[in-house]
């Protein structure tokens, strides 16, 4: 990720960074409108997430997560930024005239050729099933089930590693450190996801964060008792409870939110860190 520092005497943007490497100029047939109606409220208008707000107006880019253009070579024409995700996207022109967006593999440049299918070369950006990948291969945009499209390792800089094979199943190490079993006939894209180091970007000011739908975070201990269970007291007072809670009294800071009996529990060999 190429970062550009603001050169300004204004305190709000003095330490902010911009990504000057790519710009977005999407094709009209690969975008559509997207209505965001949440804004941290439920159907009755009651606040359910106090740190979520309205995001800046944007258009959704149709991303090809399935990579189902089998054995047809495609050429990378542009590398663009996507306001709906923290990773770059690439515009691909296939040999049959099809044009699609895919996630940008790290190191791919304009003019490179990619292909998806079985028995294709194991090179950066190619999509193929795990049966054709040797152990130790790094990948991103991994499918859970054949034909459903990539669901794992899709964030900027994400990478999963092929650890083992047994029968029709394979073992992967995900970016979170979790060990998961997946089917070998499912597709994955070779290489690491691009835009590494996006977590080191400094927004510089609160307005840039509000564009992303993130509102200011206020501690409960500085609120009134009517607004939060931690509120009230004289001066800097403790929360008055054994454990911290949410504004609605539920346990916070460490409570597991995953369903106890989820169908995919049997596919997890090692929990994430």
Swiss-Prot record:
This protein's GO CC annotations: chloroplast; mitochondrial large ribosomal subunit
SMART domains attached to this UniProt entry: Ribosomal_L2, Ribosomal_L2_C
Keywords assigned by UniProt, alphabetized: Chloroplast, Plastid, Ribonucleoprotein, Ribosomal protein
One Pfam family per UniProt: Ribosomal_L2_C
Region (Disordered): 1-25, 225-253
Any Gene Ontology biological process: mitochondrial translation
Localization per record: Plastid, Chloroplast
One annotated GO molecular function: transferase activity
Main localization category: plastid
HAMAP family documented for this protein: Ribosomal_uL2_B
Subunit structure: Part of the 50S ribosomal subunit.
Family the entry assigns: Belongs to the universal ribosomal protein uL2 family.
Name by which UniProt lists this protein: Large ribosomal subunit protein uL2cz/uL2cy
The species this protein was found in: Triticum aestivum (Wheat)
